[in-house]
Amino acid sequence: MRNAYKVLAYIVAAEVAIQAMVMVWAIAGLVKWVDGGGVFDKSIMESGATPFTEVFGIIVHAINGTFVVPAIALVLLITSFFTKVRGAIKWAAIVFVLVVAQGQIGYLGHEFPFAGALHGLNALALFSAAFYTGRRIRTAASPVVEEQPEVQAATPV
Amino acid sequence: MVIHSQRPGSGVETRGRRMLRVVLPVLATVAIVVPLAWMWQASRMPAAYSVMEMGYLDYGGHGQDSGHSHHSEAARSVTELVAEPARPADVRVDLVTRQEILKIGGRSIAGFTVNGTSPGPEIRVRQGQLIEVHLRNESVAAGVALHWHGLDVPNAMDGVAGVTQDAVPIGARFTYRFVADRAGSFWYHSHQVSNPQVAGGLLGSLVVLPPSGIAEQVDVAALAHTYGGVRTINGKAGDLRVPAEPGRRMRIRITNTDNGPMQVWTSRSFRLLAVDGTEVNRPTQVSDRAVTLTAGARADIETQVPADGTAVRVQLSKATAVIVGPQSAEVPVPPQPGDELDLLSYGSPATLGFEPAQAGRRFDYLIGRRPGFVKGRPGMWWSINGHLYPNVPMFVVREGDVALVHIENRSSEVHPMHLHGHHMVVLARNGVAATGSPWWVDSLNVAAKESYDVAFVADNPGIWMDHCHNLKHAADGMVAHLMYEGFDTPYRIAGPADNRPE
């Protein structure tokens, strides 16, 4: 269970990194497309078409943010109930709350663009929290994994 | 390796703690999973269902007088609601729908055609004529149904799969008969799997001329549509050139067939002659203003070819324009105005033909967005009066009623609201009363945080959709219905005909 918990926490952190990457990828594609004379407005946005490839960044961001990350955070929270480590539930809950807040702030950005800035800031908080949540768990296997290479390196050939 | 140290305490206490350690996580998990599973299960739709069984009845403050059931005893079927069955047709139109690859702006795009083209043929008739459209579906796999957007046709002819008819499968036919009872600019489009089918071009223009014709010398219908990201007018990428002599007056009938609002502006002053097929009363000249044309809406713009040999541009968004003037006459792209024409105060007041103050029904249509499950899918979904699909309101009226609807967009995105079978007149926006020409709409742009008070006369019995014309939103459940007491539909959503109106 600890392994699952640790992996899930790291996946949340990795997902935050992916979210940041695909969004900037999409914006870069948009800027390049507009630079080439393209018009991006509500009709194009809602047409379901992909006028430039990087639109997939927005689609991935939306699917990840709405479904995938909340689902992983929820499974992490449930896993934490069975992880007999002090603070595991607390940190899973912090991650979960930050994920929920991140989604709400993101949608709020549709109305108040400044919320988008907070969305970016909260992403850093979420990344840090998720990364720490994974890192603070010492699994039964990890000491072995950490020690073995050292032993091997120290052994003269 | 984990070493458990023996804690002090009695054996009973330790066993109790162990039990708790096992039970508490399970209980916490159950507390999270069970409500989610229940919500998921409750949102799943049966294999076939009637819109009459969906959601809850809203009598608009009027006493509930037809029992608790949506289905009243001895209800009339909407299939009876047809146009003058004994009258021969004045105009016969044959339409064949196909699923094929479209060539748009040098690109190949999977889409749909009507009589071999997209958009389909422009149907142009005179007011008062009885139109008979013979539809044959040749190859559209999901089936088709044609909706006459903006014309208040009899309910059985409204073309909504699963509500007023079954989707027409490949090889089958359906005949639409209706009287073009009002002059104006309209359009037709599929209302079966409407989001992909409309996006794929299963649509066309429908123009009804007044018996005496129109005053303008140039009359052009311009359907703006985006095919796979390519902006077009009447199916051609780029600008539409219309040859005309200097000094000619023109009426450009613009239809926005996309899912989002579009701005329209011109290179010289213009008048907005009509909105959604209804003439504006005493429209004045406009300059430095753009007209916001919401999804599904139409605007008739009147302007004049300049006398100096140049052309006039009518911009349909920044991307495309109708250019009218002598052959090869040029005109620079006019800058997009920062302000939009406010229809709340445009034109001059006139009588409405009914008294909104005497409304017997008052409905709320409050749009929100919240997390939940729709059709078994988790997500952030549009809500109507706080409810998610299918727990949407069924607004109930009786023939002859005057109804008021308070439409309020509490979400953060624009919604083009479309009521079938009726025209709504705008009474107020954000509480500010309308002072201009009667502003009649069938497709209303309700921006984020805006509210509208509209009124309509219940003069067209049946069961009607009242939905967002961002068809993606409709497919995600942003659909309510309006029903007249004493009517029922034999059609079902899904079921053997696989009716999927959105």
Model-derived regions, located:
Chain A
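Polytopic transmembrane helical bundles with strong interfacial aromatic enrichment
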Residues: 1-157
